[in-house]
Amino acid sequence: MAEVIKGKVVQVIGPVVDVEFEGVKELPKIKDGLKTIRRAIDDRGNWFEEVLFMEVAQHIGEHRVRAIAMGPTDGLVRGQEVEYLGGPIKIPVGKEVLGRIFNVAGQPIDEQGPVEAKEYWPMFRNPPELVEQSTKVEILETGIKVIDLLQPIIKGGKVGLFGGAGVGKTVLMQELIHNIARFHEGYSVVVGVGERTREGNDLWLEMKESGVLPYTVMVYGQMNEPPGVRFRVAHTGLTMAEYFRDVEGQDVLIFIDNIFRFVQAGAEVSTLLGRLPSAVGYQPTLNTDVGEVQERITSTKKGSITAIQAVYVPADDITDPAPWSIFAHLDATTVLTRRLAELGIYPAIDPLESTSKYLAPEYVGEEHYEVAMEVKRILQRYKELQEIIAILGMEELSDEDKAIVNRARRIQKFLSQPFHVAEQFTGMPGKYVKLEDTIRSFKEVLTGKYDHLPENAFYMVGTIEDVIEKAKQMGAKV
């Protein structure tokens, strides 16, 4: 058994800890892990002890390293013993982690007892070699009409999720987890990066209620935690996802909420380490930091990791260096809008603002592409006509424009869909719509043969057959 290398704490400045290793041949490497025992007082005035992990960030002097703490540093004292882990912090992987919540160091934080993992993998792993990566473009069917038709996601792709509070990001995320688990037998990893603890707790409770928790791993580093935690928690989640991809051969979904907070934490860490900031105060290594995470998200010949990342845009400035560095990696953008949520159209995905670079005939086929572009054309024309309708009314429109408005309103409603995870709230059974059914249904709507059916028959249904059935129930002549 290798000898344990030990050092001692010589300086603590907030989340930065300097550790001295005297008489060692080789200092711990950058990104390697250290651990020590933190003694502190809890809310009730009782002393407690816990393991504090740290990550080596700099070598300063001959025997000294500067480390970033992966937890609070109150209670640390100069001279206390620090143990070198011999490599990066190791994270539990495998089916044993499903249904559990972990912190950045891979420790369970859900009070459900220890995790009996058979394998532990390092937090930092290199992206797959180019020869291991899959060059095949394979569309990931989500069963959600508006996504599959207008902004297709590919296996191993990266999707940016944009939307304010209360427009349905969480429910959309849960439905994707549900559909991947139920219809593709895949697993999901949810990574909370610098978001509200309350939201993390709510998501856990909602997942328990909707029955998707057994197929999910949750890794949290919330906004009340030190910057080191928020900066590294995405890597912890990716390590767990990589096991399912590389060993189990799974198509894994990873949700990162919020990727901007990862960049923000990196800026804090960079400042603490004394690096000169670059544009707008961000770290000089901004693109490298983002790239390290994004390059690990890819398809291999064994399986895939598909990422859906919530992106906060500071002050709605799309040219800010942080979102700009993230956009460079995205294949698709999903924009949720309050305007549609207020109309009761869920998922409230804006069909005109949302994009995918894989909505092209060479990837999705001619038929899919033509149907999607015609749907977008009609919705765009409807958007242009809305101002005229608001001022002059429908009567002033030409017959052709009236037909477009009527069809667009039906298409808009048809893009809504009842979700499985929302059944208990809506009372409507969830619908999973296969891609070929989505294309066929919209193709038939575009011909105009269903323009005579009431608008509400198109609302919250699956395929065109469901529309016809609903219209019959409403007493309409089909």
Swiss-Prot record:
User: Localized where?
Assistant: Cell inner membrane
Assigned keywords, A-Z: ATP synthesis, ATP-binding, Cell inner membrane, Cell membrane, CF(1), Hydrogen ion transport, Ion transport, Membrane, Nucleotide-binding, Translocase, Transport
> What does the subunit comment say?
F-type ATPases have 2 components, CF(1) - the catalytic core - and CF(0) - the membrane proton channel. CF(1) has five subunits: alpha(3), beta(3), gamma(1), delta(1), epsilon(1). CF(0) has three main subunits: a(1), b(2) and c(9-12). The alpha and beta chains form an alternating ring which encloses part of the gamma chain. CF(1) is attached to CF(0) by a central stalk formed by the gamma and epsilon chains, while a peripheral stalk is formed by the delta and b chains.
Major enzyme class: translocase
Annotated GO molecular function terms are: ATP binding; ATP hydrolysis activity; proton-transporting ATP synthase activity, rotational mechanism
The record lists the catalysed reaction(s) as: ATP + H2O + 4 H(+)(in) = ADP + phosphate + 5 H(+)(out)
Q: Which SUPFAM superfamilies match?
A: C-terminal domain of alpha and beta subunits of F1 ATP synthase (SSF47917), N-terminal domain of alpha and beta subunits of F1 ATP synthase (SSF50615), P-loop containing nucleoside triphosphate hydrolases (SSF52540)
* Name of the protein in question: ATP synthase subunit beta
Residue numbers binding ATP: G163, G164, A165, G166, V167, G168, K169, T170
Q: How does it sit in the membrane?
A: Peripheral membrane protein
- As recorded in Swiss-Prot or TrEMBL, the protein's gene is named atpD
Gene3D superfamilies attached to this UniProt entry? 2.40.10.170, Bovine Mitochondrial F1-atpase, Atp Synthase Beta Chain, Chain D, domain 3, P-loop containing nucleotide triphosphate hydrolases
Q: Which residues cross the membrane?
A: none
Give the Enzyme Commission number: 7.1.2.2
Q: By its UniProt entry, which InterPro entries does this protein fall under?
A: AAA+_ATPase, ATP-synt_VA_C, ATP_synth_F1_bsu, ATPase_a/bsu_AS, ATPase_alpha/beta_chains, ATPase_F1/V1/A1_a/bsu_N, ATPase_F1/V1/A1_a/bsu_N_sf, ATPase_F1/V1/A1_a/bsu_nucl-bd
Write out the similarity annotation.
Answer: Belongs to the ATPase alpha/beta chains family.
Q: What does this protein do?
A: Produces ATP from ADP in the presence of a proton gradient across the membrane. The catalytic sites are hosted primarily by the beta subunits.
One GO term describing the cellular component: plasma membrane
Does the keyword Signal belong to this entry?
Answer: no
PROSITE patterns, per this entry? Answer: ATPASE_ALPHA_BETA
Claim: Cell inner membrane is one of the keywords in the record: yes
Native organism: Aquifex aeolicus (strain VF5)
